[in-house]
Amino acid sequence: MILPCPAAGGAGETLDGGDKWVQVVRRQHDPEVVVFANLLSAAECDALMLAAKPRLSRSLTVDTHTGDEALHPDRTSQGMFFERSENELIYRIEARIAKVLRWPVKHGEGLQVLRYRKGAQYAPHYDYFDARDAGTPLLLARGGQRVATLIIYLKEPEAGGATVFPDLDLQIAPKRGQAVFFSYPQALPSSLSLHGGDPVTGGEKWIATKWLRQHEFI
């Protein structure tokens, strides 16, 4: 399967983002996990949060039985979605993501912004759609399987809130403007893509998430 993948380069390398160069902080393979240093500027982080704030509501998860969205106790953040290319800021960020990850903008879901207040968390989970779930065919019809995730840190909390990968014994501390990318070539636990957000224990954490699909997302 062809997957989104940044160009070759390890820690310290810079990648062409179209309108700026993006630095690689950390990279590992099998599974592919890449941390970028400066994907967004501080001004872009602020602008995203400002635009998202009035549209926030309790975050939903995909109901795997129906394919619809529903509240779930494992996810306690607030969130919203931007439409693809909704405004100039979103267009610019999505174009940069597409350039760095070498994956078409149209193969991505709308950018989701999430706010985690003190105590909020997201229990470890997989982003792909499980073939055993009744709602999966409806989800796949919109653009095929999810094959990769990009998490961008818009605001770092005072404490807590790390992105964790339990199967990799890996923790990534939120840092404003940084992002973590990971792919999952198979929709199976063997992809080692189990991940979650630790509870925020001080301040607030804001992130933006981009899920990438096999085909054009509709």
Where do the model's predicted regions map?
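Fe(II)/2-oxoglutarate oxygenase catalytic core
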Residues: 1-218
